[in-house]
């Protein structure tokens, strides 16, 4: 269990993020077109998992915008933006913002992604949503970098994630 904060108030996650050097757990997540994708859909590409509570918050929206901008410069890399939002909300946001360099995926059906990755919030006002995390995977799905953002209203360390991607 990781202890994080929401505006200074302590909250907890269901477990810890996967360890660097381990194989990332597979997942089944829903696209904005209501297709189902798994990690194997991205095999052979480096992957950035940008995970957040809801696309409808300012910090979460900014993380998607920032990674969308960075993704346009990245070779052989997919940026997956993952939340418990309905796929329709994710699609609406990216459509309105003109964001085309990231893939939005939803864990709305059963939360199994959050459970497998240890990042479900288990108490406090955001209970049941994902905590803010970034995980970088190499082309074989091996975890190369993780960040569990300590204060949920803060943005992730984009620079560190992008540097880890260079080494993946």
Predicted segments — roles?
Residues 1-168:
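Chalcogenol-based redox active-site neighborhoods
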């Amino acid at each position: 269990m990781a202890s994080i904060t929401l505006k200074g108030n302590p909250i907890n996650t269901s477990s810890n993020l996967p360890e660097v050097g381990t194989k990332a757990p597979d997942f089944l997540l829903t696209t904005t077109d209501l297709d189902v994708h798994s990690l194997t859909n991205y095999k052979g590409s480096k992957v950035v998992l940008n995970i957040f509570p809801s696309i409808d918050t300012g910090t979460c929206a900014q993380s998607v915008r920032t990674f969308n901008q960075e993704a346009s410069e990245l070779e052989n890399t997919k940026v997956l933006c993952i939340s418990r939002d309905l796929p329709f909300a994710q699609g609406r946001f990216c459509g309105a913002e003109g964001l085309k360099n990231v893939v939005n995926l939803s864990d709305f059906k059963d939360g199994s992604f959050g459970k497998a990755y240890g990042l479900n919030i288990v108490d406090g006002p955001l209970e049941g949503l994902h905590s803010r995390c970034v995980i970088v995977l190499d082309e074989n799905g091996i975890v190369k970098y993780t960040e569990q953002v300590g204060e949920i209203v803060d943005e992730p360390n984009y620079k560190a994630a992008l540097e880890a991607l260079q080494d993946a």
